[in-house]
Amino acid sequence: MKLVKMSMALLLAAISFSGIQAQTADEIVNKYIDALGGKEKLQEVKTVYMENTSQAMGNEGPSTINLVTGVGFKIVSDFNGQSVIIAVTNKGGWQVNPFQGASAPTAMPEEMLKQSKGRLDPFGALNNYAAKGNKVELQGKDGNTFKLKVTNADSIETTIYVDATTYYITKVVSTAQMMGQTMEVTTTFSNYKKVDPAGVFFPYSYEISYGGQFSITTTVNKIEVNKTIDPTIFDMPKS
């Protein structure tokens, strides 16, 4: 009888702990949404246009981002007169990368597409995560940041670090397929600023490190919210 009571107590404790973990993860996500401007303001963001300056391997060049929420994302980066293009839509994706021998538009590999779908939301995987089929688990704290594991509908896992004071995302760790191999990609974010008249916050500085082999540092020079963007720019050009 004592064994049964002890087992029941352990079971109830486990259920209780699980509930606390889930509630805590949701609480962190909600505070992140509030830090960016609040749910209502984020929902009003239909498009985002950015002009940036990026540095990679001693080279510097401009880049632009066009995003229509839930529809398409496109980034064009220019280095040494060469353009690198990555485009993702809710139906597929394509890319141009002359530095990897792909000067003509090519369809994005399925695995890369699964990893890139999150770009269709300007506020990332935590925004409306349940509606997207994402699962969020709190994995504790790392210094002054909460560590969240996000698993999307395609079972792709990402680790997101949220500052415990500001509730901004400071780092995202994921994996990517590049040059025939899987490597860890770490993106760090900083210098969050308010974009008016939308009243939402975006990071104006970020660095992407590819497996420690090389990195791209980007400074955002301009952000426009709800600017008219022609969705046909996301279409893959015909050869």
Locations of the language-model features?
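Bacterial Sec-dependent N-terminal signal peptides
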Residues: M1-A25
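Flexible, processing/modification-adjacent segments and terminal tails
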Residues: Q21-D34, Q95-I156, A164, A176-M183, ...
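N-terminal mature ectodomain segment of secretory-pathway/periplasmic proteins
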Residues: E27-G101
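Extracytoplasmic
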Residues: V45-T47, G70, A131-G133, G143-T145, ...
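Short, surface-exposed charged micro-motifs
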Residues: T64-I65, S83-I85, E137, E157-Y161, ...
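A short, sequence-level motif marking secondary-structure junctions
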Residues: I65-G72, T89-G92, E110-M112, D163-T166, ...
